[in-house]
Curated annotation (Swiss-Prot):
It catalyses: 4 porphobilinogen + H2O = hydroxymethylbilane + 4 NH4(+). It comes from Prochlorococcus marinus subsp. pastoris (strain CCMP1986 / NIES-2087 / MED4). One of its GO terms (molecular function) is hydroxymethylbilane synthase activity. Its cofactor is dipyrromethane. Binds 1 dipyrromethane group covalently. The modification S-(dipyrrolylmethanemethyl)cysteine is found at C245. Disulfide bonds: none annotated. Keywords: Chlorophyll biosynthesis, Porphyrin biosynthesis, Transferase. This is Porphobilinogen deaminase.
């Protein structure tokens, strides 16, 4: 029997390859007559390491090159960390599948001399590394006495910088640490009361051509309904605010019975203004819950905060 061949476009970073190999293994496990290959490549976000992500100002920093491969027929699907995938996709492409989500929380990772501290007890002036404006804004709001410094590079590079003494601690996604085998380095899971996570954090998104019914059917075996409902609500919230992956917008979602609850926040980069609200609705209509939450935050001034941020980076 001739096997159906499927090619995956992936970033070549260690974490991206771990995630893509998991997708490959799961697809081949569920569909025995499927032969999956991987084309790994560097994206713009992987290449530009000397500039803060937000200053590059592109919503497709980690996805455009993968999408281009699909659009010209060189790849059938692309595997993304869902938090990196823009909410508005190129014509002809769709988010075909959302996998079962890992813990979406942020995690505190410390060097040896700071193991006695939690985030709340770090001494004034402690150097905290993060490349995320979302984390930066929320932590500045809660802990203005700490010193925040941009950190770039993959997870392993960031941990090496931490251990060399360049930082007292760094903030990373708990899911990425777990997937790379660094779960033991999670010193503290940061509570939602301190830092709401990124939209889609902890889940993988599989993108493909909108009209490729055969591929859509194949990848549907990895779809997790609960994770999908939560992430669709979160992505709708982000889309309605016209925010990208690099702006200070955070969320948390939960499902109970037939309802989905969504908490969201928008903050200024300096941490001096932070607005938060929540929305609850029917689990059948997750995107409506996201839209309602965005509307609430707009009434509280979210548009003004975000426009100031966009203007700030436009001038640089």
């Amino acid at each position: 029997m001739t096997k159906f061949k499927l090619k995956i476009a992936s970033r070549r970073s260690k974490l991206a390859m771990v995630q893509t190999l998991w997708v490959k293994e799961q697809l081949e496990k569920n569909i025995p007559d499927l032969e999956v290959s991987i084309e790994a490549m560097a994206t713009q976000g992987d290449k530009i390491l000397d500039v803060a992500l937000a200053k590059i100002g592109d919503k497709g920093l980690f996805t455009k090159e993968l999408e281009a491969q699909m659009l010209v027929g060189h790849a059938d699907i692309a595997v993304h960390s869902l938090k990196d995938l823009p909410t508005n996709l190129p014509d002809g492409l769709t988010l075909g599948c959302i996998t079962k989500r890992e813990d979406p929380s942020d995690a505190l990772v410390v060097n040896k001399k700071n193991k006695i501290y939690q985030l709340e007890s770090l001494p004034p002036g402690s150097i905290v590394g993060t490349s995320s404006l979302r984390r930066l804004a929320q932590l500045r709001y809660k802990f203005p006495h700490l010193d925040f410094k941009d950190i770039r590079g993959n997870v392993i590079t960031r941990i090496e910088k931490l251990d060399s003494g360049e930082f007292d601690c760094i903030i990373l996604a708990a899911a990425g640490l777990k997937r790379l085998g660094f779960e033991s380095r999670v010193h503290q899971i940061i509570p939602n009361e301190i830092s709401l996570h990124a939209v889609g954090q902890g889940a993988l998104g599989i993108e493909c051509k909108s009209d490729d019914k055969e591929v859509l059917k194949i990848i549907s075996v990895l779809e997790d309904k609960v994770s999908s409902q939560r992430c669709l609500a979160e992505r709708s919230f982000l889309r309605e605010l016209e925010g990208g992956c690099q702006v200070p917008i955070g969320v948390n979602s939960s499902i109970q019975n037939d309802e989905i609850a969504l908490i969201g926040m928008v903050a200024s980069i300096d941490g001096k203004r932070l607005i938060k609200n929540e929305s609850i609705g029917n689990i059948k209509y997750p995107e409506e819950v996201g839209k309602k939450l965005a509307e609430k935050l707009k009434l509280q001034g979210a548009d003004k905060i975000l426009s100031e941020i966009f203007e700030q980076f436009r001038d640089k």
